[in-house]
């Protein structure tokens, strides 16, 4: 997989505290063992529970503190999607990573789980042989678990036993809409962030969004406010192939915006949203005066393909100062270099704030670099974009 969120320096358990506590949930004992060994190859992670189905996970979570759960989707007795709301009810601060196969069905269920409150997902290799030799999978898994483990501990103290979850079938949770994962509480800052002046007038000609860990949930929230926007909306979310196809479909159905994976050579049209397809960089080129999609297999940037930086650089070449760039929750610093190009051209950058980011890596990078004209809670970003997008053209 070339869509890894990249190598992120994640603060481990501080002050000599225990390693991050993880529960692995999978009906295959072999897979549980392989995932456990991959996780425990990192000294900052300890697998404290390994169970075979969702019901066992619920029972275990009610008895001991867990920071992160790696949750399989398809299991007997109680599957991952059905167990998810009960796990979050038992401990709203626990971070859940859905482990999914690289299939359309797996991608669809993973995105439904993200809408229901899962913090992230990870595509599993399709066989134990692939899993045994998948160094990229192991690296991505350990990085996500450490980042989300740190987030869980900032969200609230881990208890020596959580409130017992309501058994499945009793007073079922509502399934409409979507649930944002528990936000990460802001850490004390070393100093105030520098915010750039917002241009007093002028309307952007394009809206560009970059995101990674926690991104799908954030995208649904933001794009729900932009269904009337006349600008094209270009999105790079760190995801593998198949998942990006399903993400575009979910955006269309959830947000009321016509959205699809970007296709090489197609003209970019206002009022539509385009998602970078997995394993391709999404660029914009000028063909006979028409902004046009160009997909490339150029080397990953920031260990990512698709990556936000090349998309933003190409957008600046096409639209100059008429670019509005939005960096949402995600690991790493992808998007920072591209936002530097946006600012140098006279465009505007918006970053998600730390308190509402699942992981404040990407938005934190642009915020601490002084590139943002606004650093906002997630629920304020959509209305803010809507206001700027509706300005009169200068």
UniProtKB/Swiss-Prot annotation:
Sequence ranges assigned to domain CheB-type methylesterase in this UniProt record: 200-382
Catalytic activity: [protein]-L-glutamate 5-O-methyl ester + H2O = L-glutamyl-[protein] + methanol + H(+); L-glutaminyl-[protein] + H2O = L-glutamyl-[protein] + NH4(+)
Classification via SUPFAM superfamilies: CheY-like, Methylesterase CheB, C-terminal domain
InterPro entries linked to this entry: CheB-like, CheB_C, CheY-like_superfamily, Sig_transdc_resp-reg_Me-estase, Sig_transdc_resp-reg_receiver
EC number of this enzyme: 3.1.1.61, 3.5.1.44
Chief localisation class: cytoplasm
Catalytic residues of the enzyme: 212, 238, 334
Residues covered by the Response regulatory domain: 21-139
GO-annotated biological processes: chemotaxis
Amino acid composition bias (Low complexity), ranges on this chain: 162-172
Positions bearing 4-aspartylphosphate: 72
UniProt-annotated stretches for the region Disordered: 148-201
Modification note: Phosphorylated by CheA. Phosphorylation of the N-terminal regulatory domain activates the methylesterase activity.
A GO cellular component annotation in the UniProt record: cytoplasm
Compartments in which it is found: Cytoplasm
Molecular function GO terms recorded: phosphorelay response regulator activity; protein-glutamate methylesterase activity; protein-glutamine glutaminase activity
Function comment: Involved in chemotaxis. Part of a chemotaxis signal transduction system that modulates chemotaxis in response to various stimuli. Catalyzes the demethylation of specific methylglutamate residues introduced into the chemoreceptors (methyl-accepting chemotaxis proteins or MCP) by CheR. Also mediates the irreversible deamidation of specific glutamine residues to glutamic acid.
Domain notes: Contains a C-terminal catalytic domain, and an N-terminal region which modulates catalytic activity.
NCBIfam families: PRK00742.1
Similarity annotation: Belongs to the CheB family.
Protein's name in the database: Protein-glutamate methylesterase/protein-glutamine glutaminase of group 2 operon
Biological source species: Rhodospirillum centenum (strain ATCC 51521 / SW)
Gene expressing this chain: cheB
